[in-house]
Curated annotation (Swiss-Prot):
It is an enzyme of class 2 (transferase). Its EC number is 2.5.1.46. The lineage of its organism: Archaea, Methanobacteriati, Methanobacteriota, Methanomada group, Methanococci. GO terms for biological process: spermidine metabolic process. Catalyzes the NAD-dependent oxidative cleavage of spermidine and the subsequent transfer of the butylamine moiety of spermidine to the epsilon-amino group of a specific lysine residue of the eIF-5A precursor protein to form the intermediate deoxyhypusine residue. Belongs to the deoxyhypusine synthase family. GO terms for molecular function: deoxyhypusine synthase activity. One of its GO terms (cellular component) is cytoplasm. Pfam families: DS (PF01916). Keywords: Hypusine biosynthesis, NAD, Transferase. This is Probable deoxyhypusine synthase. Pathway: Protein modification; eIF5A hypusination. It comes from Methanocaldococcus jannaschii (strain ATCC 43067 / DSM 2661 / JAL-1 / JCM 10045 / NBRC 100440) (Methanococcus jannaschii).
Length: 330
């Protein structure tokens, strides 16, 4: 009934013995790789990212692309990303409009922990928006609008002076510069936009109008009867692809899926794929969506290199990413 088994070698499955004097950090660093299931994927991600960090410290040129969806910034992961940007642990950012605007809004007023099970009609009547179990009152967007109208005026005047339409990445850089001028240091010290501006780390946002920024742009153009102000996304795709092409090695770290994920890995298609990839996602592959596409699918397209070191962690990024960053950076 049982066939004779072959001898196999590898990592023996083992967990921590909690009677030992052991910290949570030691459990994650020493045992996660050996526990199995998604813990082992977290362990592998730590190993890959540590390897990238060690090579960069030695002077190896590895361009780190980092992508995330707007809900990541809605959550407390925003401050962790700002830390990475401040300390130049990532080189290129790709996000959605929400990932830009919510970073700015949080410099003005905080988002509030709410609940998943709340009547939507009641929240609507109270002027409170819900992102999962995070509440965002409308006054946050009103405060944001006041700043954005002034910012759009600056961008329009710059466009008139130079005769040049700014790209979405230049828009994000200028927004960081605008924050530096207008906001107090305490308000901006945990901002992704601010540190990206200070460290000259480009933020690409191919869908810059898909969010509150787009709403504000609509109001600005309608109120001012403006037909001049434009944002160029075409030249950004050249810039993003060229960065990938001209990099000796690349690494792609992506939280979530959608547009940021594909923009990053598609840029790496032009160099026969990235050398390292870490995905953190809850999306499933069964509907053929890009969000759920596993690394192996990226290999088939040439977006992830055939010899790349990669891992996909299936789970909530708000749980996984703080552990991952702490174990790599501390």
């Amino acid at each position: 009934m049982l066939k004779e088994s072959e001898d196999i070698e590898g990592i023996a499955i083992e967990g921590p013995w909690l009677e030992d004097d052991i910290s949570l950090e030691e459990i994650i660093k020493k045992y996660y790789l050996k526990i199995g299931f998604q813990a082992s994927h977290i362990g592998k991600a730590i190993k890959i990212w540590k390897h990238i960090e060690e090579k960069r410290k030695k002077g190896d040129e590895i361009t780190v692309f980092f992508g995330y969806t707007s809900n990541i910034v809605s959550s407390g992961l925003r401050e962790i990303i700002a830390y990475l940007v401040k300390h130049k642990k990532i080189d290129i950012i790709v996000t959605t409009a929400g990932g830009v605007e919510e970073d700015f809004i949080k410099c003005l007023k905080p988002f509030i922990l709410g609940d998943w099970e709340v009547d939507g009609k009641m929240l609507r009547e109270k002027g409170i928006n819900r992102i999962g179990n995070i509440f965002v009152p409308n006054d946050r967007y009103i405060a944001f609008e006041e700043y954005m109208m002034e910012f759009f005026e600056e961008i329009l005047n710059l466009q008139r002076e130079t005769g040049k339409i700014i790209t979405a990445s230049e828009f994000c850089y200028k927004l960081g510069e605008f924050m530096d001028k207008k906001l107090k240091s305490k308000e901006k010290e945990k901002s992704i936009l601010y540190w990206a501006y200070k460290n000259n780390i480009p933020i690409f946002c191919p869908a810059i109008t898909d969010g509150s920024i787009g709403d504000m742009l609509y109001f600005f153009k309608k109120y001012n009867k403006d037909e001049e102000l434009k944002i160029d996304v075409a030249n950004d795709i050249v810039k993003l692809n060229d960065i990938a092409i001209n990099s000796k090695e690349t690494a792609c770290i992506v939280l979530g899926g959608s547009l940021p994920k594909h923009s990053i890995i598609n840029a790496n298609l032009f160099r026969e794929g990235t050398d390292y990839a870490i995905y953190v996602t809850t999306a499933l592959p069964w509907d053929g969506s890009l969000s759920g596409a596993p690394p192996e699918e990226g290999v088939s397209w040439g977006k992830i290199g055939a010899k790349a070191d990669y891992v996909e962690i299936w789970g909530d990024a708000t749980i996984i990413f703080p552990l991952l960053v702490y174990c790599v950076m501390k």
